[in-house]
Amino acid sequence: VESEVIVQSDTLNKMQAEVQAGVGMVAAVTVDEQGTYNFPYHYARGWRYRLCGQKTIATKKRFSFCCTLLTNELLHKADFQLLDPTKNWYDVTISHWSVHLGLINLLMLGNPVLHFPHASRPWKRLKYTHPLRYYWRKFTQKLDKI
C-alpha cells in the first residue's frame, strides 16, 4: 500500500480472500474523494455498469501498486532479477509479467481505496496542470521511467 492511499480496516483481508490458485495479483480500485475511479484505474470507469454487479473482475490491463497484493505464486514464478535497473517504476512491467506467466490479475471494484495521485511526488502533478513542463522535466531530467 503506497503512502498516498487510505484503506479501510478490512481492505487487505478482502484482498487476501480473493487469492486462490492461478491468481497473480489482486488490486483494489482507487477512487478520489467523490468516489470516482481515478488514476491509474480510469480505464475501469464504465465497467461497473457493464458487469452486472460483479465486485471483482479478471483483467489483463495494467495494475498500479497503489494498493496491490502480489501472490506467493507470482513471487515464485517471476524472475525479478530481469527488472530493468534503469527504470523507476515496475508496476506495469510486473502486472504484464503476471499475465504472461499465465496468472490471473483481479481488480476489486467493490473494495475501493482513497488515492491522492502523486502526493509523494508533487512534480508529477504538473502532468495535469502544466503538461509541457511535466514532459520537459520528465525527458530532460530522465524522471519517471516506466
Annotate each PLM feature.
Residues 50-72:
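A recurrent flexible, glycine/aromatic-enriched loop bordering the glycosyltransferase active site
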Residues 2-6:
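The conserved acidic donor/metal-binding loop of glycosyltransferases
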Residues 106-126:
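Active-site donor/metal-binding and catalytic loop motifs
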Residues 123-146:
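Catalytic core of nucleotide-sugar-dependent glycosyltransferases
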Residues 65, 77-96, 100, 105-107, ...:
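Donor nucleotide-sugar recognition loop
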Residues 26-42:
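Short beta-strand-to-loop element that shapes/binds the nucleotide-sugar donor at the catalytic cleft/hinge
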Residues 7, 70, 75, 108:
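A conserved hydrophobic position in a structured secondary element of the catalytic/binding core
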Residues 10-28:
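Conserved donor-nucleotide/metal-binding helix-loop-beta segment in metal-dependent transferases, i.e.
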